[in-house]
């Protein structure tokens, strides 16, 4: 199935999430839930849809660049302008086609009041740099962007599970 057919036919659905009631006190205390997921899994969209609907989340913070915002808006108005996005993104990030469609629907329904893009690291890199950026630098930028989100709205932050592990991840000596 091609990308256009996937995004035009997909509709998110609410699913049963066991022990969802455990999350509610955390959300009430901090107004932030961080959800780690495996990139490219279409079922993630149903999880996010359910969390937003059942916990009254009003802001979504996603591990993605603001450069995808125009494409999400095109999906929101049913124009599906693929020229606005690098299609490799769909398998390599939290933004699968299904997730983008889910976000667009939640925005259409005014369920989400705000969308925040927390992965700005690659937007400002020097393409001519000889030394590649450190994975730790990106983690620091992601953390700063998350901490920069004001606590006025209940927020769901979606990131790859690699970023959400409770311990420091080492990569061949690079932290």
PLM features: residue spans?
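Compositional signal for N-terminal targeting/processing segments
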Residues: 1-175
């Amino acid at each position: 199935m091609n990308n256009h057919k996937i995004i035009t036919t997909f509709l998110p659905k609410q699913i049963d999430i066991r022990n969802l009631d455990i999350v509610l006190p955390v959300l009430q205390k901090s107004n932030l839930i961080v959800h780690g997921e495996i990139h490219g899994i279409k079922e993630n969209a149903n999880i996010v849809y359910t969390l937003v609907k059942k916990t009254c989340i009003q802001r979504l913070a996603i591990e993605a660049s603001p450069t995808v915002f125009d494409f999400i808006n095109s999906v929101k108005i049913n124009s599906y302008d693929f020229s606005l996005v690098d299609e490799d993104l769909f398998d390599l990030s939290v933004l699968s086609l299904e997730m983008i469609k889910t976000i667009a629907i939640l925005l259409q329904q005014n369920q989400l009041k705000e969308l925040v893009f927390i992965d700005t690291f690659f937007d400002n890199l020097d393409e001519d740099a000889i030394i590649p950026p450190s994975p730790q630098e990106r983690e620091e930028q992601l953390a700063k962007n998350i901490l920069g989100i004001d606590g006025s709205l209940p927020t769901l932050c979606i990131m790859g599970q690699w970023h959400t592990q409770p311990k420091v991840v080492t990569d061949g000596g690079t932290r």
